[in-house]
């Protein structure tokens, strides 16, 4: 496992919630968007993505609905709920605090 994948496991929920902010997406599109926005640094495997989506759905932070993908295939589309938007704000604040703390250590040593 690469270091970027190790980091990804600790931030996957945050990344999924953030990527879903503009609107509903199916699983493959979520993974592609994370890869695209991270300029190919972060790659989300299906074996990590779908359990995370189910966990987020169980927490009522995302909801899933069946629809048709851009290639006319049936796919489950995930979207943020009101609770998901609130959770995203909380997660973003936590991430900012953590990344600021790490940056502080890296600058000082």
Where are these regions (language model features)?
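Beta-hairpin "wing" of winged helix-turn-helix
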Residues: 57-74, 79
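Basic amphipathic alpha-helical segments that dock to polyanions
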Residues: 49-56
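Amphipathic alpha-helical dimerization/coiled-coil segments
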Residues: 85-109
């Amino acid at each position: 496992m690469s270091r970027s994948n190790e980091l990804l496991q600790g931030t996957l929920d945050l990344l999924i919630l953030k990527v879903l902010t503009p609107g509903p997406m199916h699983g493959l599109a979520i993974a592609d968007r994370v890869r695209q926005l991270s300029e190919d640094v972060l790659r989300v495997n299906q074996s990590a993505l779908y359990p995370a989506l189910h966990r987020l759905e169980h927490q009522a932070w995302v909801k899933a609905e069946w629809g048709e993908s851009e290639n006319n295939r049936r796919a489950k589309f995930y979207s943020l709920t009101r609770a998901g938007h609130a959770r995203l704000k909380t997660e973003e604040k936590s991430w900012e605090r953590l990344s600021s703390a790490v940056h502080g250590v890296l600058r000082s040593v």
